[in-house]
Amino acid sequence: MLPPINFKGWIDENRHLLKPPVGNKCVYTEAGDFIVMVVGGPNSRKDYHYNESEELFYQVEGDIVVKIIEDGVPRDIPVREGEMFLLPARVPHSPQRGPGSIGLVIEKVRDDKDTDGLMWFCDNCGNKLYDEYFHLENIVTQLPPVMKRFNESTEARTCDSCGSVMTPPTASK
């Protein structure tokens, strides 16, 4: 059994590791049922994450906006410091974190049958540009290579509906 931790102390000790583009670090690497991570801002993401299970967001410092696609329609959900938000399963989402923001995110460890995905939508017309699905085993290491593949591919970033080309996100500092 793991002992309790001083969460605020943990954040202070690990703040330097919360870097773009995703900026997350797992609190408990030994956990079997949950992925418990802290995510820092700013971030520079244009992707939407697809998860077959719910995700719990608790905003510790600063505010964020969780962009979602609900029934094919984009929507913004503000989550302010001190607020908690339970995102339903299978809702594409893109947390937008401002400078200095810190949030706790709790997700279920994926079963063998679970599939995660990253997807991008055209900034101009909302058409889906690209998606890639995978079995998630390590959230810290698996997302950046998918983002890199998309960002480095002009073909993937070009909308086949309106011809607009998505500009890769600018790295946040």
Could you tell me what each predicted segment is?
Residues G126-F150:
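Short recognition patches in nucleic-acid-associated and regulatory proteins
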Residues R110, G126-D131, V165-M166:
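Cys/His-rich microdomains that often coordinate metals
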Residues V39-G40, Y50-I69, G103-I106:
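Short, conserved beta-strand element in jelly-roll/cupin
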Residues V36, D47-H49, E54-Q59, D76-I77, ...:
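His/acidic/aromatic-lined binding-pocket segments of jelly-roll/cupin-type domains
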Residues P99-G117:
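A short hydrophobic beta-strand segment most commonly corresponding to one strand
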Residues M1-G40, R45-D47, Q142-K173:
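A short, N-terminal "cap"/entry segment at the start of jelly-roll beta-barrel domains
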Residues W120-C125, C159-C162:
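Short cysteine-rich clusters marking metal-coordination/redox-active sites
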Residues V39, P78-P99, E107-K108:
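Conserved metal-binding segment of the jelly-roll/cupin
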